[in-house]
Amino acid sequence: VKDGVTVGIGTGEQDRVGVARIAVYKAYTKYANQLAFERHARKYDELVLLAAQGKFDASLIAAIDADTRAARAGLPGSVMISDAFFPFRDGVDVGLKEGVSCVVHPGGSLRDWESIEACNQADPPAAMVFTGQRAFKH
């Protein structure tokens, strides 16, 4: 979440690192889509198709890709939220690598200290909030 907007959601996975990567991927995809629409009034995938057909300048797509990477999809300063605790730091590390500034989760893992340590070691350090309540109920 950033500026009151959900920028990526990873859902329905059993792999905690994989689901964090899915959320990051979605954030990058949505950011590129936003740039494509702002610059060319078309969806990113539509521009890719047009470029493959020789009807759009592929260098303009490369510029969108470069700008998306440079901005890290707008993720720096965002908040990573989980409906269940992080049993290890690896899922948290995925978000921190992209510039997440705060991690919110219920806590309760025997290894919560690893996630706390990850936030403390981030550059800049990230905040961690424990809600004390799981939203994942099945």
Locations of regions flagged by a protein language model:
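Terminal or standalone catalytic/regulatory effector modules within metabolic enzymes
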Residues: 1-6
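Feature captures the catalytic cores and cofactor-binding loops of soluble hydro-lyases/lyases
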Residues: 14-138
